[in-house]
């Protein structure tokens, strides 16, 4: 029998989160399109299944990082318009009807020539730099967009930017100010593409909503009150060992039993996205109770202290991420223990875990 490591994705929770964002936009009295971000395999949740759900819910666009991600969706039958955020690859753009994001003039010229050669009009979005310091047109963005608009066979459907610290009101307002000036300039020229800058945290600012929003983490249950995490990661106890006081556990003996102890072994390690930095810090749930991770997390195995759990047995379920009864371990908890962010936690679990999709109401 193969080892059990399962990422359970609750599509009911996904639907709840998407609907909550739509309700927020409606209550804010803003008519906004939604660009659902499904890059990195939908943050580890499985892009194809997640995109299908969003398509049924009437999402306006999907957003991916690279063309290869979009091609997987197209070949799975996803028809929703797909924006490719960070790529210069062109073959997939034309073959699979994708919308590339342009982040410099040279890229725009190249796409224009290719579109002209193929005899098609290519819809594009343009990224402008407002404070992220990563990708985007940063020198004379207004004039550069004006020049791009004059290129053959390109249709500017959108202009975007990205918040670098949406939790910082002053900095975010400065970014919005720069973005608004570009929007005003283009409107004065009679150009009215779709403007979008708001990520999940940006939804908190009404003035950031513009013409579209790009929720990511929030869709998967994190970032604000009332959103429900969609992913549960579980495994089963591989072994249970009775060890005397003073026994060192795992590599380096970083944990030594302080009393006679019951130590469980689970078939999960850092190769599965369960970070080594969780050693002696994290907790998991066994039989409805939290128990600590002890010793160094190994490549394929992790040890947990079961001393206080009654009648525990081999093959008992172990919750690494998720809720059971009154106990819950979230990606935010794991991120805090590991010294990282929830995004990294969710995207790291997808590698060797088998996914199972369910439709269940949250208890």
From Swiss-Prot:
Q: Which cofactor does it need?
A: pyridoxal 5'-phosphate
Kindly tell me the pathway this chain contributes to: Amino-acid biosynthesis; D-alanine biosynthesis; D-alanine from L-alanine: step 1/1
The Gene Ontology biological process terms listed for this entry are: D-alanine biosynthetic process
EC code: 5.1.1.1
**Keyword Isomerase on this protein?**
yes
One Pfam family from the UniProt entry?
Ala_racemase_N
Q: Which reaction does it catalyse?
A: L-alanine = D-alanine
List positions binding substrate: 134, 299
Q: Which residues form the signal peptide?
A: none
Q: Which keywords describe this protein according to UniProt?
A: Isomerase, Pyridoxal phosphate
Molecular function terms from GO:
alanine racemase activity; pyridoxal phosphate binding
Q: Which InterPro entries match?
A: Ala_racemase, Ala_racemase/Decarboxylase_C, Ala_racemase_C, Ala_racemase_N, Ala_racemase_pyridoxalP-BS, PLP-binding_barrel
Which leading EC class covers this enzyme?
isomerase
Residue list for modification N6-(pyridoxal phosphate)lysine: 39
Q: Which SMART domains match?
A: Ala_racemase_C
Q: Which superkingdom is the protein from? A: Bacteria
User: Which residues act catalytically here?
Assistant: 39 (proton acceptor), 251 (proton acceptor)
State its role.
Answer: Catalyzes the interconversion of L-alanine and D-alanine. May also act on other amino acids.
Q: Which PANTHER family match?
A: ALANINE RACEMASE, ALANINE RACEMASE, CATABOLIC-RELATED
Q: HAMAP family recorded for this chain?
A: Ala_racemase (MF_01201)
Similarity comment text for this entry: Belongs to the alanine racemase family.
Name this polypeptide is given: Alanine racemase
């Amino acid at each position: 029998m193969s080892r059990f490591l399962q990422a359970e994705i609750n599509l009911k929770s996904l639907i709840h989160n998407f609907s909550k964002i739509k309700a927020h936009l409606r209550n804010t009295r803003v008519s906004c399109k939604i660009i659902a971000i499904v890059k990195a395999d939908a943050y580890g949740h499985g892009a194809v299944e997640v995109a299908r759900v969003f398509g049924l819910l009437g999402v306006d666009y999907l957003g991916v990082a690279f063309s290869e991600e979009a091609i997987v969706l197209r070949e799975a039958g996803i028809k929703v318009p797909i924006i490719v955020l960070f790529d210069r690859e062109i073959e997939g753009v034309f073959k699979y009807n994708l919308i590339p994001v342009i982040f410099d003039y040279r890229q725009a010229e190249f796409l224009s020539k290719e579109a002209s050669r193929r005899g098609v009009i290519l819809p594009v979005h343009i990224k402008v730099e407002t404070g992220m310091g990563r990708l985007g047109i940063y020198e004379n963005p207004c004039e550069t967009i004006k020049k791009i608009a004059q290129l053959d066979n390109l249709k500017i459907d959108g202009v975007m930017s990205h918040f670098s610290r949406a939790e910082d009101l002053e900095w975010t307002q400065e970014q919005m100010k720069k973005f608004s000036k570009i929007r005003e300039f283009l409107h004065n020229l009679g150009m009215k593409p779709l403007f979008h800058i708001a990520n999940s945290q940006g939804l908190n600012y009404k003035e950031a909503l513009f013409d579209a929003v790009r929720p990511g983490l929030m869709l998967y249950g994190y970032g604000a009150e009332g959103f429900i995490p969609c992913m549960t990661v579980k495994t089963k106890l591989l072994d249970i060992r009775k060890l005397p006081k003073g026994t060192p556990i795992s590599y380096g003996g970083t944990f030594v039993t302080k009393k006679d102890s019951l130590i469980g072994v689970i078939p999960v390690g850092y190769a599965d996205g369960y970070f080594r930095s969780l050693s002696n810090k994290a907790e998991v749930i066994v039989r409805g109770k939290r128990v600590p991770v002890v010793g160094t997390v190994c490549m394929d195995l992790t040890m947990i202290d079961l001393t206080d759990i009654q009648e525990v047995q081999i093959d008992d379920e172990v919750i690494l991420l998720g809720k059971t009864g009154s106990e819950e371990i979230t990606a935010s908890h794991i991120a805090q223990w590991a010294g990282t962010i929830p995004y990294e936690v969710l995207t790291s679990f997808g590698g060797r875990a088998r996914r199972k999709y369910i439709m269940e109401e949250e208890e």
